[in-house]
């Protein structure tokens, strides 16, 4: 194995620690802090000349601080003559701003971030469940987008008390993801929630395509933000006779009123991964369970360093 160096910012310290343990490689010695005026301070405290360096840093909230930490760390390592620098970004912030809506005068911020990372000296990006896969094309360097679904599916398969389970897509846009999950769950049945607003200033109506009566529903998505739409979906499923509702998502964004929304009894359990640390408020709910992606990300790092196939990790 080449000389691998692992470094971590302040966004996901526990995930970084787990990855380092899986690889039997200690995290690199670096100072990542703040100057008295709030500017980011980075210093690499060990030799990285010619090394294959991986920086583990989600760009979750505080998004701008974590993104800037990553960028400054890349620059510090580049100036220290690192051989190759891979940004391991388990959760890629700004991924939802991936296109202009109609003729709106808005930026494509995902492209801005991609340009920023490329220009500062990142040689490769490893990320997980991009909100829009086309973001890979925004970069001028290779991007490996791995999937959290195998970890989520393995957990679902361990639920021995599921009654007549059915996979549910929370919207039309998530049908491909839900279908893939349903296929891996022994071709489980699937339902779709079709959200429509009949006319302006009228509440959104949720139509459920599929029979969920007396069934355990498994809602799958790439991320949960405020959880408002998720709760409405769970309520609609319960109103249609669903027995229980479980929500599975890779990224636990959990912003704004998420804690209040997730406390809604319509949701029986929420299962996420550790790409984003949970706040104390969310942990106090005792309804949210976290799975780790450390083994998968560690294996991806090993394969990248050894020039092995990443896609082979997900071959059926």
Curated annotation (Swiss-Prot):
One of its GO terms (cellular component) is ribose phosphate diphosphokinase complex. This is Ribose-phosphate pyrophosphokinase. It is found in: Cytoplasm. The lineage of its organism: Bacteria, Pseudomonadati, Pseudomonadota, Gammaproteobacteria, Pasteurellales. The keyword Lipid metabolism does not apply. Its cofactor is Mg(2+). Transmembrane segments: none annotated. It comes from Haemophilus ducreyi (strain 35000HP / ATCC 700724). The active site is at 195. It comes from the Bacteria.
